[in-house]
Regions:
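Walker A/P-loop
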Residues: 71, 85-110
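A generic structural motif
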Residues: 16-26
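Conserved SAM-binding loop
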Residues: 72, 119-120
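Conserved helix/coil segment N-terminal to the catalytic DExD/H
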Residues: 150-173
Length: 173
């Protein structure tokens, strides 16, 4: 309707002239541009919040939450630390590189901070795999993790929900 009414040309833009807003993920690029070109940028409080928790603190945290037989690899620890320190990021990791362990560490940190987590995976088999992996990593999954797909209902008390997007689409708001 907006296209037909000639209020919108159908293009999605990263900056909105109407609202004056920019996608938050672009802030570092705007900062870099401003620094490079000698411009001053003033950001609202909290917009550029990134943590500076030392890597050793993450290592100690991981040692506490994993079973003794599991060891986290350096690149997994780096990815975990990056995700927590930067709060918003995309982590790209190849097949069989231990993504589930990275996700587990992030979710355990969020749970420790009193936050709830929603993990959306593409298939029901991955819902089950993540649930089993969390048990293997030392979490008592039945107390903390809720699986959401056909046959399972949401337990509001559990801090972690693992679901497919299709199951969430049918979930009552």
């Amino acid at each position: 309707p907006s296209v037909r009414a000639k209020r919108w040309d159908g293009k999605i833009r990263l900056y909105s002239k109407a609202t004056g807003k920019l996608y938050r993920g672009l802030v570092p690029y705007v900062q870099h541009f401003c620094e490079k070109n000698g411009h001053t940028i003033i950001l609202p409080d909290g917009l550029n919040r990134t943590g500076s928790v030392p890597r050793d603190d993450f290592s100690k945290f991981v040692d506490k939450i994993l079973t003794k037989s599991l060891k986290i690899r350096d690149y997994q620890l780096d990815a975990f630390a990056h995700a927590i320190n930067h709060r918003r990021c995309i982590l790209l990791s190849p097949t069989a590189s231990g993504k589930s362990l990275i996700i587990y560490c992030i979710i355990r940190m969020m749970t420790t901070l009193g936050k709830r987590s929603l993990l959306v995976v593409p298939t029901t088999s991955l819902v089950e795999q993540m649930y089993k992996d969390f048990e293997d990593y030392s979490l008592k999954a039945e107390d903390y993790v809720q699986r959401k797909y056909y046959g399972y209902e949401i337990d509001e008390k559990k801090p972690v929900v693992v679901s497919t997007w299709q199951s969430l689409a049918t979930f009552d708001k």
